[in-house]
Structures are given as structure tokens and as C-alpha cells.
Amino acid sequence: GADFQECMKEHSQKQHQHQG
């Protein structure tokens, strides 16, 4: 959901997989 976009911004420069 919205939390996913927040996570993507924080880990934009890193490879971070997040299921939301």
C-alpha cells in the first residue's frame, strides 16, 4: 500500500525487496 512507496524512497539507492 502507501507504506510500499515510502520504503522504495528510503531504499531507492539499494536493492530492497518489499512485499506490500
Curated annotation (Swiss-Prot):
Q: Where is the composition biased (Basic and acidic residues)?
A: 1-13
Protein origin, superkingdom: Eukaryota
List the keywords (alphabetical).
Answer: Antimicrobial, Fungicide
- Swiss-Prot/TrEMBL GO biological process terms: defense response to fungus; killing of cells of another organism; negative regulation of translation; xenobiotic metabolic process
Which residues lie within the region annotated Disordered?
A: 1-20
Q: Does the keyword Lipoprotein apply?
A: no
- Job of this protein: Possesses antifungal activity against B.cinerea, M.arachidicola and F.oxysporum but not C.comatus and R.solani. Inhibits HIV-1 reverse transcriptase and cell-free translation.
According to UniProt, the name of this protein is Alpha-basrubrin
